[in-house]
Amino acid sequence: MQTATVLVEKSDYRPSEDEPFMNDRQLEYFKQKLLAWKEEILRESRETVSHLQKETENHADLADRASSETDRALELRTRDRQRKLISKIDQALRRVEDGSYGYCEETGEPIGLARLEARPTATMSVEAQERHERRERVHRDD
């Protein structure tokens, strides 16, 4: 998310607890942060595809081939996780547009600026997320 941070930091603006929660300026700030993060992931994905296409060499040594296949599998797993992250970013951008961004989907209360800074795709407050995870653990243990 390095580029996302760089693009958002072009402005000195930082959301503050002293202003109305999710005002137009905050919404625009988080929208830009999400868009920059998405663009960074897409750029990395394009680089991966390019790298994988170039690396079609045949390894004579079995160990080299195994190592290359392991690297390739790891790269593809990483890209799959990032594909899922793009979906979460797109969902967050839709919430920005419909005005529900920044509010807990469970309680309707503000998620909090610090949490959104750390995890811009968050859909629940810390407390609601902890309750959700406890319920999941209980159901998993059944």
Swiss-Prot record:
Residue ranges for the region (Disordered) are 1-20, 51-70, 119-142
On the tree of life, the source organism's domain of life is: Bacteria
Q: Which GO terms describe its molecular function?
A: zinc ion binding
**Chief location bin:** cytoplasm
Metal-binding recorded as keyword? yes
Q: Quaternary form?
A: Interacts directly with the RNA polymerase.
Q: Could you tell me which PANTHER family the record lists for this protein? A: RNA POLYMERASE-BINDING TRANSCRIPTION FACTOR DKSA, RNA POLYMERASE-BINDING TRANSCRIPTION FACTOR DKSA-RELATED
Annotated transmembrane regions: none
Q: What does this protein do?
A: Transcription factor that acts by binding directly to the RNA polymerase (RNAP). Required for negative regulation of rRNA expression and positive regulation of several amino acid biosynthesis promoters.
Organism lineage string: Bacteria, Pseudomonadati, Pseudomonadota, Alphaproteobacteria, Caulobacterales
Q: Could you tell me the keywords of this UniProt record? A: Cytoplasm, Metal-binding, Zinc, Zinc-finger
Q: Does the keyword Transit peptide apply?
A: no
What organism does this protein naturally occur in?
A: Caulobacter vibrioides (strain NA1000 / CB15N) (Caulobacter crescentus)
InterPro entries hit by this protein = DksA_N (IPR048489), DksA_RNA_pol-bd (IPR012784), DnaK_N (IPR037187), Znf_DskA_TraR (IPR000962), Znf_DskA_TraR_CS (IPR020458)
- Example of a GO biological process term: regulation of gene expression
Gene Ontology cellular component list? cytoplasm
Protein name, entry field: RNA polymerase-binding transcription factor DksA
Pfam families registered for this protein in UniProt: DksA_N, zf-dskA_traR
Renumbered to this chain, the Basic and acidic residues biased-composition regions fall at 128-142
Q: Where in the cell is it found?
A: Cytoplasm
| Zinc finger map (dksA C4-type) | 104-128
Q: Which family does it belong to?
A: Belongs to the DksA family.
Report the HAMAP family cross-referenced here. DksA (MF_00926)
